[in-house]
């Protein structure tokens, strides 16, 4: 009986040490406040809450050149940064989060604008021009039909890529050239942020 109690105590101590180790690693991996280098007339970024997702009717808008509210974050280094989101609903890009590939980052700003920037030379390549539409916080997801949308806190779409078609599942990838593209399961490129694709 004493051996059984001793084994239970030893197991409890080991579990406690593991939990403390995991909690310490989680705290150490969370970035502290990052420095923001704003473009003219920009706003600073602060952490926001996440939101639960629901399917809504898509809104389509045509993206154009970056807006004056564009900010370029100096992103803290991460061990395994995301460079893509997939249509299975597991990956959602929240405000303060970025897709990263080399010197390029695609980020959701506090005003609801999705922007692609070159973090090395602090330039903006493309923005969705969806600033101040809907109500913060905003998030980006790739829906189950292949349409990539920014949604507000009420799950209303404020901007969508307009892509519907191809083979499921879809993948939105920030490429090494800084373009954000949607491909279907077969690898067919259906939409890209900064270049026109043939119909």
Swiss-Prot record:
What GO terms are given for molecular function? Answer: carbohydrate binding
**Location(s), subcellular:** Secreted
- Here the segments flagged for biased composition (Low complexity) are 49-73
Comp. bias (Polar residues): 35-48
Q: Which residues form the Bulb-type lectin domain?
A: 84-195
According to the record, the residues making up region (Disordered) are: 35-74
Out of the domains of life, which is the source? Viruses
The record's annotation in InterPro entries points to: Bulb-type_lectin_dom, Bulb-type_lectin_dom_sf
Entry's SUPFAM superfamilies?
Answer: alpha-D-mannose-specific plant lectins (SSF51110)
Q: Which GO terms describe its cellular component?
A: extracellular region
The record's section on SMART domains has: B_lectin (SM00108)
Full protein name = Putative lectin L633
Q: Which organism is it from?
A: Acanthamoeba polyphaga mimivirus
């Amino acid at each position: 009986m004493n051996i059984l109690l001793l084994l239970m105590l030893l197991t409890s101590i080991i579990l406690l040490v593991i939990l403390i180790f995991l909690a310490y690693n989680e705290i150490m991996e969370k970035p502290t406040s990052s420095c923001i280098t704003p473009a003219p007339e920009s706003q600073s970024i602060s952490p926001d809450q996440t939101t639960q997702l629901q399917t809504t009717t898509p809104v389509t808008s045509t993206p154009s050149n970056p807006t004056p509210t564009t900010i370029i974050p100096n992103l803290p280094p991460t061990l395994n940064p995301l460079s893509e989101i997939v249509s299975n609903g597991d990956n959602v890009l929240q405000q303060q989060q970025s897709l990263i590939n080399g010197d390029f980052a695609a980020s959701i700003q506090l005003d609801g604008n999705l922007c692609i920037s070159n973090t090395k030379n602090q330039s903006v390549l493309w923005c969705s021009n969806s600033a101040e539409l809907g109500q913060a916080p905003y998030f980006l997801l790739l829906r189950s039909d292949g349409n990539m949308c920014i949604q507000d806190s009420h799950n209303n779409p404020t901007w969508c890529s307009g892509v519907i078609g191809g083979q499921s599942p879809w993948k939105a990838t920030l490429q090494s050239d800084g373009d954000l593209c949607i491909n279907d399961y077969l690898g067919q490129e259906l939409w890209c942020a900064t270049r026109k694709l043939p119909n």
